[in-house]
Amino acid sequence: MRAALVAVAALLWVALHAAAWVNDVSPKMYVQFGEERVQRFLGNESHKDHFKLLEKDHNSLLVGARNIVYNISLRDLTEFTEQRIEWHSSGAHRELCYLKGKSEDDCQNYIRVLAKIDDDRVLICGTNAYKPLCRHYALKDGDYVVEKEYEGRGLCPFDPDHNSTAIYSEGQLYSATVADFSGTDPLIYRGPLRTERSDLKQLNAPNFVNTMEYNDFIFFFFRETAVEYINCGKAIYSRVARVCKHDKGGPHQFGDRWTSFLKSRLNCSVPGDYPFYFNEIQSTSDIIEGNYGGQVEKLIYGVFTTPVNSIGGSAVCAFSMKSILESFDGPFKEQETMNSNWLAVPSLKVPEPRPGQCVNDSRTLPDVSVNFVKSHTLMDEAVPAFFTRPILIRISLQYRFTKIAVDQQVRTPDGKAYDVLFIGTDDGKVIKALNSASFDSSDTVDSVVIEELQVLPPGVPVKNLYVVRMDGDDSKLVVVSDDEILAIKLHRCGSDKITNCRECVSLQDPYCAWDNVELKCTAVGSPDWSAGKRRFIQNISLGEHKACGGRPQTEIVASPVPTQPTTKSSGDPVHSIHQAEFEPEIDNEIVIGVDDSNVIPNTLAEINHAGSKLPSSQEKLPIYTAETLTIAIVTSCLGALVVGFISGFLFSRRCRGEDYTDMPFPDQRHQLNRLTEAGLNADSPYLPPCANNKAAINLVLNVPPKNANGKNANSSAENKPIQKVKKTYI
């Protein structure tokens, strides 16, 4: 019994701790958009465009696509057709592409790189039917004219789906891509400098996700096969690498190689004795500057996932630029022999000047420093997460995180500021979240998921996100897939479902506050927002305010958002190639859920964007949290254990029989009689004979005596003479 209780207690402890880790933070609001609420740009509707956001130019976006660069207005996502740039591959290049085994869709010119050289000139690079080319265009008389054309190998990928990045800084293009048709020669390039060819210690099958400049450095974020783990198996780690802007290459034979290339691991993990790692970086934000726990820091937010053959896990981690720079000033990591462990290099073995640093002229560096940095590009210390743990974790078999965009330091009426995170998934969703403890602490995480928005059709991944800040309340989030570009508002504070102060404050949305004068939920763009907390009620940290009359008493939960709507709206002037399989049954659906563990659940039917109530099309399903299910399971186990123990005890008492004394062997009977009062005789050392009513057995022969007929009881029925057996031997 004791062992069983110990086992159940251990099960309870493990279940509660597991539930505490895997319990996803529930969104406060679910939103599914209809046609009237979404601005959409479709581009080429007959073929896949492979849209890629390339540049923001004042109030327009430059988007790379199939044979075209679109210039799209940020106001309404309409195209400035007079500024469109078309660039098709030549017939000879397409024929050569076909001979290499590629399809017609592959053998097009997908624009992947664009950089503004000055106000009237741009640099554009495209895949050009798997033979990359670059061009300089100049704006003359309202039209773009080609100034020059040159090979784009090392600047642009061959495949439009390849994970490549590029940035233009101080008149130089820095690219991270592949330099061959098969994609087996990855490189970080700025002519004429590149990383080492076929050196797994520098780049080992990388997937680049972002490039940015900071001070005198260019930073590259990517994931790759970990060379330091290769003796134990195969694993993918997330990396941040840097090069110096003014690196001129090394002396002599190192003239076309980086002398400042270093890389570190990014550590996004759930802390503990055995941390759980999210090893594969998918996207990063730009550098965000803000106030965190009273300190001004510059952060980068990143999206990380588990491997595709692991559990479906995604996380968002933040890293400070200070920690990244410190990791590059720390010890190097090396493997002395092929079978040795990767260990930190002792400081006495590091030459002077320290390898990897930015110098005035890298061509004057001694050979020992250049050789050292060539073979010791990996740093020993990983870059830790800023808040000591992930800001948001999602464990889901339905989707993984793909992209992130951040609206930095959104001000609230009480003077605080929060970074609002917009996270795209591979299932067409956008999750809006924040760390409500970020203003008060730099080492605490209190995750809040404000909204979960089904922006794209289910199964269509979000390829890019971009926050557009405009005057007034016209700011928006641009969502990009391969085939369409959409723009949505950053908030839904004015929804007619938010009817009172408690519901507005419980959203914990920095964009929204309750207006005590107008008695409605007001957005951040309100002209009176500067009145502050004297007029507006908001509490991002707790999600409740005493001015609202206490804690909310009910939870407003709508039916599950349909994932495969089948009805198709009519009269829509534009249609996506996915539109036939994804048309919402209602124009707009918003579901508000107050996240409170002590509330009484209630339901609310779907409401369209005009505010009219519609009957619910689905039966409302109860919602159970992980804690509730865990408690129910453990309680059932304990109950079953107690009932089983009591039943077994009663059954054993009922079925217990009388003592069995008629044993077949005399020594066993003597042993029992010796222990009884009648058989005990202290004066005699011998056991008294026991009475036996049965006939005596001859112990010598072990047979009973003959019967009345003179025959032994065990003898055969007839006594016949024994005949000799005749044997014949052959």
From Swiss-Prot:
Keywords tagged on the record: Developmental protein, Differentiation, Disulfide bond, Glycoprotein, Membrane, Neurogenesis, Signal, Transmembrane, Transmembrane helix
Subcellular location: Membrane
Glycosylation sites: N44, N71, N163, N267, N360, N539
One Pfam family recorded for the sequence: PSI
Disulphide bridges: C97-C107, C125-C134, C244-C358, C268-C317, C493-C512, C504-C521
Bilayer topology annotation: Single-pass type I membrane protein
Region (Disordered): 708-730
PROSITE patterns membership: SEMA
Function noted in UniProt: Plays a role in growth cones guidance.
Gene that encodes the chain: SEMA-1A
Family: Belongs to the semaphorin family.
Signal peptide interval: 1-20
Organism of this sequence: Schistocerca americana (American grasshopper)
Domain Sema: 28-490
Domain of life, source organism: Eukaryota
GO cellular component: plasma membrane
UniProt cross-references to InterPro entries, sorted A to Z: Plexin_repeat, PSI, SEM1A_sema_dom, Semap_dom, Semap_dom_sf, Semaphorin, WD40/YVTN_repeat-like_dom_sf
Residue spans of biased composition, Low complexity class: 708-720
Residues that span the membrane, as ranges: 631-651
Regions of this protein lying in the Extracellular compartment: 21-630
Entry GO MF terms: chemorepellent activity; semaphorin receptor binding
Cytoplasmic side: 652-730
UniProt-recorded name of the protein: Semaphorin-1A
CDD domains on file: Sema_1A
Tissue: Dynamically expressed on a subset of axon pathways in the developing CNS and on circumferential bands of epithelial cells in developing limb buds.
